[in-house]
Amino acid sequence: ESLDRMTGARGEISRVPAVELAGLRLGESDQSIPLLREVLDLIDGRVPLIIELKNPRRRTGRVETAASKDLAGYGGPCAVSSFNRRTVAWCARNLPHLPRGQNVMKFRRGWFAAGQWQSSVFREFQTRHSTRLQFIGCHIGALPSPGAQRFRERGIPLIVFTVRTPDRLALANAHADNIFFEGFIP
């Protein structure tokens, strides 16, 4: 994930040391990027969390291991998700007690988990078996979708992101089981 979306700085967040991240500000605020452990301490189990692990690479382990160390001591309800199906599979092997979700979006050539090297989640239902998914995270702009509907028919909940307007809320209510909101209170 690029730093420019939330901080205006350039670079990939996974390549910047935590001490440097602490010096960056989120948007126009005086808030810095919190570490996962800081977020977990702040939330302290008061609300359920879905932790999105952002690892765009084929090789897994570094990001996932760091997150699992922080999550090991967390007593609150949480799940993990990723666009990277290898990350989700890593979590199935190493964090089997946590619910897992595969995030998907619609790219020009159809449904894909992020990355050119990944195959279509909706055309290859095998992802469900290799990662034992408990939910699918789906971009609202990709709905309605026959592929998303097939997952729901198989009992896998569909959580849509990111709803910012009342018309998108109506679309999400018609095609999904739960919703991520941003800058919008329904």
Question: Predicted segments — roles?
Answer:
Residues 1-108, 129-134, 138-140:
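Metal-dependent phosphodiesterase/phospholipase catalytic core, i.e.
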Residues 31, 103-104, 110-186:
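C-terminal active-site rim and adjoining tail of enzyme catalytic domains
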